[in-house]
Amino acid sequence: VATLLYRLARFSFRRRWLVASAWTAVLLVLGGGALTLSGQMSNSVTIPGTEAQQAIDHLKEKFPQAAAGNATARVAIEAPDGQALTDPAARATVEDLVGRIKTAPGVAMVADPYQAKTISADGRIAMAQVSYKVPATDVTDNDREALKSAADAAKSAGFTVEFGGDAIQGVPATEATEGIGVIVAAVVLAITFGSIVAAGLPLLTALIGVGVGMAGVMTVSGYVDLNSNTPILALMLGLAVGIDYALFIVSRYRHELAEGHDPELAAGRAVGTAGSAVVFAGLTVIIALVGLTVVGIPILGQMGVAAAATVAIAVLIALSLLPALLGFAGRKVVGKHARPKQNGKPAMGERWARYVGRHRVPVLVTAVVGLLVVAIPALSMQLGLPTDATAAPDSTQRKAYNLISKGFGEGTNGPLIVVIDSANAPDPRAAATEATDSISRLPDVAAVTQAQFNTDGDTALVTVIPKSGPSSEATEQLVASIRDQSDRLSGATGAKLSVTGQTALQIDVSEKLAGAMLPYLGLIVGLAFLLLMVVFRSIIVPLKATLGFLGSVVATFGAVVAVFQWGWLTDLLGVDSTGPIMSMLPILLIGVLFGLAMDYQVFLVTRMREDYVHGADARDAVVSGFKHGARVVVAAALIMISVFAGFIAAELSLIQSIGFALAFGVLVDAFVVRMTIVPAVMSLLGKHAWWLPKWLHRALPNVDVEGESLARHLNQRRELEGARS
């Protein structure tokens, strides 16, 4: 592999105009596709096979007039100060508003609050339920704007009108918050390299890679139904790894130039050595992300595949476009004011490794205890999906949620739809009455409506209003309690009972995600162990790496719970809303952090193994690995952290939590696990860290991530050239 990459890099260096033109053409073609072929993305999160989804499918077949699965909106109306909605003038304004909403595009029905009796006890707040003809995925931005515009007259009269529900959510914009991360990355690169050219190359290649990846995702959205969150992970990861992979290769290129090689040979050697590690690191990230498809949750699979494709593009650009750009830059990457080597003074990484080696036991204990302490909040982690309650405080969804909660209780924001299948019941109406009576006696039930039957009389709908909000544990328990009534009802009346609605759907999704987390974690840990055993030809090194990865994961879970669930440091971080942790976050974090953790493991430990194999003492090899790799790994980690942390400034709490989790995870894994625990354990074990049974040594393939085959190839070429001369 190393020799192949060496030849690819030299070809790209020589034919730089061709390679640069080819990548420019790819970017332009996909950019054109994104502009002309992209489709509408949706916010819906569904999991085939869940009870709530099965109930929706049943309603679509037996009760089409119920419009199950179609978009809904809740309109919250508050009268001006000193007025009541029961006043004739106020009533006329509200009825005019309802009439305007009925004529809005896509609206199928509006429940008049006076007829539906959805006016608060004090007469100040009303709620109008709006049903659409199409699912939320098909509600356009123009439809949403038309709905909001219908309230202009009422607002002019002094009424407060806000909108909530899945019809209002729209597609979250991927804001320019990543620009903060790019600026910090530029500063870190400039300090690391001491050259504007060297600092600019990783940024340029990363931005091109992200452009190609995002354009590809947008183009695909015209042919495949994608969730609106699909591009977010691809954007975050594409930018971060794109900078990192180029950083490793540019750093090695500068080293090869310093060794006296001409630029073309230096580019070949840099890609042949550092590029091999980039290939392996990228492959681990891709495998972890594609592995999200086995979880059985469509949105996670989409996010994983899109991000994996963007990472693959970042690898390809680092191996082909970057050496072409090095051909244009030549020796300019060194810079006129590059810092000379400091004679006699050890590098920062070497000094740190020696310190950890001398104090390995207290350092190891301190780091492990610190991880465990930070992980403590994870014991109380609650999972959920974004609702109007977690929307930005100044958004109309959040304001509508607060108004409805104020007027009718939080549960009104998340009604449960109970479906009663009476096809096998001798007396369907008696069965429905029995169901509503038993449900009304359950704890946390605020109200139960009368059963509404379809035209055939074999399926009925009952709306249950919980006392608690959609994301509360009490509501989750209520859904379980209603479902527990099904067997008893079936035995007594022959009817079957199921629960659906947006709240029940979210509960089912969260439970499925929580159940998938441990199997996916097991898959990732097993994969990590096998991959690292192949690369480092050791049992202890992979075991240490995977245990360190688990430590990073649980510590990050703890930090996320402390901030986004408990509300610690929210003012400092600019987090506007707290509540249950997004259900998808743990699995996403496991997949992404695994790939990034393996990046740092490979870049640091590869040099240790290389020196140990060539005869260095095991503990000296640890110092050597840090001497050559720590500076670049620190820069790479700071760049990753800055890119991810930039998303904490996003408007949506979902994006904020992803950005914070990834930034904190990289911080812990890079600086606590890889830079502290790894050298401490390696120094403690010495040569025993590299133990591998002979039979396993023979059975494992040799991937040569250290580039030993390239060194032999270059030595043979030099010997042949010497013999000819």
Segments predicted by a language model, with ranges:
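A short glycine/threonine-centered beta-strand motif
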Residues: 77-79
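Membrane-embedded transmembrane helical bundles of large multi-pass transporters/channels
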Residues: 1-39, 107, 123, 131-383, ...
